[in-house]
Amino acid sequence: MAEPITKEQPPPPAPDPNSTYPPPSDFDSISIPPLDDHFSDQTPIGELMSDLGFPDGEFELTFDGMDDLYFPAENESFLIPINTSNQEQFGDFTPESESSGISGDCIVPKDADKTITTSGCINRESPRDSDDRCSGADHNLDLPTPLSSQGSGNCGSDVSEATNESSPKSRNVAVDQKVKVEEAATTTTSITKRKKEIDEDLTDESRNSKYRRSGEDADASAVTGEEDEKKRARLMRNRESAQLSRQRKKHYVEELEEKVRNMHSTITDLNGKISYFMAENATLRQQLGGNGMCPPHLPPPPMGMYPPMAPMPYPWMPCPPYMVKQQGSQVPLIPIPRLKPQNTLGTSKAKKSESKKSEAKTKKVASISFLGLLFCLFLFGALAPIVNVNYGGISGAFYGNYRSNYITDQIYSQHRDRVLDTSRSGAGTGVSNSNGMHRGRDSDRGARKNISATESSVTPGNGSEPLVASLFVPRNDKLVKIDGNLIINSILASEKAVASRKASESKERKADLMISKDYTPALPLPDVGRTEELAKHLYRSKAEKQKALSSGSADTLKDQVKTKAANGEMQQWFREGVAGPMFSSGMCTEVFQFDVSSTSGAIIPAATNVSAEHGKNTTDTHKQQNRRILRGLPIPLPGSDFNLTKEHQRNSSSKEIKPASSMVVSVLVDPREGGDGDIDGMIGGPKSLSRVFVVVLLDSAKYVTYSCVLPRSGAPHLVTT
């Protein structure tokens, strides 16, 4: 067994005055036991060198063994190959820690009892306090190692670890190792260390320079590659542009050559024409200057065929021969005469003058036509009020105070078919289109034209067409439009009421009461001496025509009332003891009329042709809800003995005349005079009425509105019993 290393520590050595190391500090005062008991810190270095076998002289280092060193390549891992001869392995050459150096990993053979030989661990620089790292498990080791005073770094721990690995069962067993160091091995180790340091520096520099060169070469190659590519692209562009320019020049030259050829051909053609014209001119001059004998005229050559130009002149030409160019072109040297420019200004002026003349003519025609149109309008407007378009008559605006039967004839012809039929018994109403009227009052014109009403009466329609109408009622001196469907509904109701009384219709027909058109009064035919008074009624203004006939002749009204009173056939206007004004033959005036228009969706009235029959003293029991409401049953108009067709009836045949169908539709009250409602069946209430409006349906196709004037309150009136 070897001696244990645990023993008393020797006292710290005295500081060496020749030593270069600084004086030990408090930490350095702690003594560290050496790995080998044969060496101590107090032993001088000279003795150690002598023990190692080195001479006392200078120590020399040689680098003869540099070739035997192994340097790994860049791609190889830093592994030291194992030498089979001495069973040693060189460690990694990479620095690991502060005490980096060439550290050898001790390989422990399988045979644990044998002596373990390890390579020496030599550090570059190791402080003195690094021996603390080897303390601990190294107290049980006896490793005689040279240069133990320099510290062993981590070698002690490595060896101990290897030893412990080889013998894990006995950790506290001290391992005796005898390291045999030879002089040659020591020298080789030191030389190898220095060579390795130098080689590492050289290798680093070479690597850096190599990397530098490789980077520079790569950059230079990249730059040169880009420049070459640019040069190639530039060359390609230049070649393409040069080729395109050559092609353009070639095409341009070809076009110019083609133009030159065309010009030469044109010049040749023109030269031929000029020579032909000049020859013809010379021939004509010769003929004029000679005896007047004209040679036979040669026909002109066809188009495109001109006589060739001869180099020698014509015998009759006074001018010298042509000078031909040497190039072969037949262009003469004589100047070609230019054509005189046309007078464009004169033509433009002529065109302008023509356009101005045409415009003036157009304006004249337009003005004349416009004047003619104005004249026609003026003529038509002046004659329109005179001519009665509806009935083909002429109004008496230009007749003045002529005492002629023609006015009477015009009245009869103008107001025919406008007779309101009233029965004396009040049974019904109707309109007869009687054309048997007096054509004159002269004794010379004794023949009278009698036409039965049945021949000229208008037959009612079959009721297949829808009828739509509108009613205009005067209100506040204005005409207010009222829907005609209300009137048509009233007509239907009235026709139903009349149809129920058809069996008791009266067969007697009395004279008709004529109502003049265009607001003219329906007066009896006056004597010849009263034509002026009739003309006064005919030529009144429109406002006067819409008023009552009270402004007319008072004597006429009195005579008519007396006649009606004498006849005793007037009917009552209101019932229950209230005396009302009665109608007379001169109290109704036509206000307006309108035809029923046929449109889809309207009410279709019945097509029955019946006459209304209404008994005497008929009372309307319905109350008036509005001043314009339609009455339930038609109100008959009283008959009259004085009739325009009375004389005609005496001279006519005895057969019965059937008038056309007519019906009183409604009776309206003037809103300015009527009250708001009925008072005991009275239309106007306690306020007296001056006029009423009566709407009559003629032949189920035309509505006529009459304005009937009631006598004044002071006028005489009768009440039938």
Swiss-Prot record:
Chain intervals for the UniProt region annotation (Disordered): 1-51, 87-232, 337-359, 422-462
Domain bZIP: 228-288
Glycosylated sites: N450, N462, N609, N617, N643, N651
Spans annotated as Basic motif: 230-261
One protein family per Pfam: bZIP_1
InterPro entries: bZIP, bZIP_sf
Basic and acidic residues: compositionally biased ranges: 125-141, 204-216
GO CC, any one term: Golgi membrane
Motif RRIL cleavage motif location, chain numbering: 627-630
Record's bilayer topology term: Single-pass membrane protein
Stated role: Transcriptional activator involved in salt and osmotic stress responses. Functions as a stress sensor and transducer in a signaling pathway that resembles an ER stress response. Following salt stress, BZIP17 is cleaved by SBT6.1 (S1P) and S2P at the C-terminus and the N-terminal bZIP component is translocated to the nucleus, where it activates the expression of salt stress response genes. Functions as a stress sensor and transducer in ER stress signaling pathway.
Family assignment from sequence similarity: Belongs to the bZIP family.
Protein name: bZIP transcription factor 17
